[in-house]
Amino acid sequence: MPKERRSRRRPEPIIRWVSLTLTLLALCQPIQTWRCSLSLGNQQWMTAYNQEAKFSISIDQILEAHNQSPFCAKSPRYTLDSVNGYPKIYWPPPQGRRRFGARAMVTYDCEPRCPYVGADRFDCPHWDNASQADQGSFYVNHQILFLHLKQCHGIFTLTWEIWGYDPLITFSLHKIPDPPQPDFPQLNSDWVPSVRSWALLLNQTARAFPDCAICWEPSPPWAPEILVYNKTISSSGPGLALPDAQIFWVNTSSFNTTQGWHHPSQRLLFNVSQGNALLLPPISLVNLSTASSAPPTRVRRSPVAALTLGLALSVGLTGIKVAVSALSHQRLTSLIHVLEQDQQRLITAINQTHYNLLNVASVVAQNRRGLDWLYIRLGFQSLCPTINEPCCFLRIQNDSIIRLGDLQPLSQRVSTDWQWPWNWDLGLTAWVRETIHSVLSLFLLALLLLFLAPCLIKCLTSRLSKLLRQAPHFPEISFPPKPDSDYQALLPSAPEIYSHLSPTKPDYINLRPCP
C-alpha cells in the first residue's frame, strides 16, 4: 500500500521563542559532571513544522595564573589551526543528521577547559533547519548533554533556544555522580516567556544551594560580544585578570559597534552566524561560610584632637559666614550703584521733558499774544472776552520742577549712611575695597581665636581631669586564710565582706548614674 502523503499546506503558525537560561558558579573542583536533559512534547508541532533547538554554554573565565594570559595553565587546544598565533574558537559540529531523512537522537559531551579570556560560546550540538522537501522526517525531540568542568573558576550560563508553534518543554539538570547534590525539578509549561522561565530557574537555584547567596546584578543587559573565528580584533582593557589582559571581541557588521559591548534589543535577542542568542542579567552564587566581615574596632581619641577639630570647624564656619556676608555686601553695593545710575537717567529724562514743555508753553503764549493783538487791531476785545473764556493767563507755571532738586542729595545721604563704617574708599574701586574689607575681617577673627584658644583648651582639659577624679572608687577587699579551718570558702559571706571594709568608709556604696 502506498504511503499516504501528508499535505504540505500549513496554517499560519504562531512562532514563539522559548529560552531557558540557568547561571551557576563553577566550583574549584578537579572535575564536575552535570547531566542536562531537554524534551520537546508537542507532536503536532514536531511533525507539521520545522523544529530548531540549540544549546550553548557561555563561560566568563577568571584566570588563576596571571602569567598564562590569555590561556589557563595547561589548557588544551581544540585544534592545531591558529589565527595570529592563537587557536581557533571551538565550535562543535552538528551531530547525527541526514539531509533528507530521519535524524537520530544525539548525545554529545562538551568539555570546556578554561578557554580564552572573556565570553566564549559553545554549541553542543546544533541543529540546522530541516529540509523543506521532506516533511515526514523525524525530528530530534530529546537532548541529553553531559558537561564536564575541569578547574574552571567562574560563571557559566546554560541556554536552550527553541522556536515553533507553542512547544511543550521539560527541563531537568542533575549533578553526577553525587545524587544528594543540587537536583532541579522539572519545568513543564505550555509556553513560558524567556524572562519568566529565567526567574523560575533562579528560584530553583536558590532552593538547590541553601548555603549560597545569589547575587543578581540589576544592570541593563549589556553583554560582551561573542568571539567568532576570523572576525576578532584585539583591544586593551581591564580584562578579568591582573595585570591587564588582552580581550578579544567580535567585530561583525551585525553588531555595528567598536566599543566591544552589545546592547540587545527590546526582546533581548541578537543574531550571530550560528543562530539567535538570548542575553539576560548575570547572577552568581557566593558561599556564605567564606563571606565574613572584620570585627569592628574602636579607637580612643584624645581630647586635644577633638578640640583641635572643633576649633578648625568653627574657624571654617566663621570664615564661610564672613565670606557670605562680604559677598552679600558686594551684591547690595552693586545694586545701589545700578539704582543710582537709573536715578540719574530718570532725572535727565525729566529735565529734558521739562525743557520741551517750556518750549511748548512759550509757543502757546506767543500765539496768545498774537491773537490778542490781532483782535484789538480789528476793533474787538481781547481773545478771552470774545470767546467767553472765564480765565485767561499768560504766565508759565514752573514750580513742580523744583522738587527734582531735592531727590539727588537725599539719595546720596542714604547711600552714605548704609555704607557706614566702610564709607572710606581712598580713591579705590569697589571690588578692591570689598577685598580689603574681607581680608581685614578674617584677620581680626583669626587674632581673636588665637587669644581665646589657650583659655578654651585649659578650661576643657581641667574639666576632663575633674570628671576623671570624681569617678567612684571601690575599696580593695582581701580575705586572709583561716588557720583553724581545713575548708576555705570560695565565696565569703556578707558579714565577712563588711568586716574587711575600711572603717573610714561607710558600709554601703552609693550608685549614681554617670555624668
UniProtKB/Swiss-Prot annotation:
Keyword presence, Aminoacyl-tRNA synthetase: no
Domain comment quoted from the record: The 17 amino acids long immunosuppressive region is present in many retroviral envelope proteins. Synthetic peptides derived from this relatively conserved sequence inhibit immune function in vitro and in vivo.
Function of the protein: The surface protein (SU) attaches the virus to the host cell by binding to its receptor. This interaction triggers the refolding of the transmembrane protein (TM) and is thought to activate its fusogenic potential by unmasking its fusion peptide. Fusion occurs at the host cell plasma membrane.
Any GO BP annotation: symbiont entry into host cell
Disulphide linkage map: C212-C215, C212-C392, C384-C391
Motif position, CXXC: 212-215
Region described as Immunosuppression: 365-381
Residue ranges, annotated region (Fusion peptide): 304-324
Post-translation changes: Specific enzymatic cleavages in vivo yield mature proteins. Envelope glycoproteins are synthesized as an inactive precursor that is N-glycosylated and processed likely by host cell furin or by a furin-like protease in the Golgi to yield the mature SU and TM proteins. The cleavage site between SU and TM requires the minimal sequence [KR]-X-[KR]-R.
Signal peptide per UniProt: 1-33
A Pfam family of this chain: TLV_coat
Glycosylation sites: N129, N203, N230, N251, N256, N271, N287, N351, N398
Topological domains annotated Extracellular: 34-435
Subunit structure: The mature envelope protein (Env) consists of a trimer of SU-TM heterodimers attached by a labile interchain disulfide bond.
Keyword terms of this UniProt record: Cleavage on pair of basic residues, Coiled coil, Disulfide bond, Fusion of virus membrane with host cell membrane, Fusion of virus membrane with host membrane, Glycoprotein, Host cell membrane, Host membrane, Host-virus interaction, Lipoprotein, Membrane, Palmitate, Signal, Transmembrane, Transmembrane helix, Viral attachment to host cell, Viral envelope protein, Viral penetration into host cytoplasm, Virion, Virus entry into host cell
Transmembrane regions: 436-456
Protein name per UniProt: Envelope glycoprotein
Segments carrying motif CX6CC: 384-392
Entries under InterPro entries matching the protein: TLV/ENV_coat_polyprotein (IPR018154)
Any one GO cellular component localisation term in the record: membrane
Site (Cleavage): R301, S302
Cytoplasmic side: 457-515
Coiled coil stretches, renumbered: 330-376, 388-420
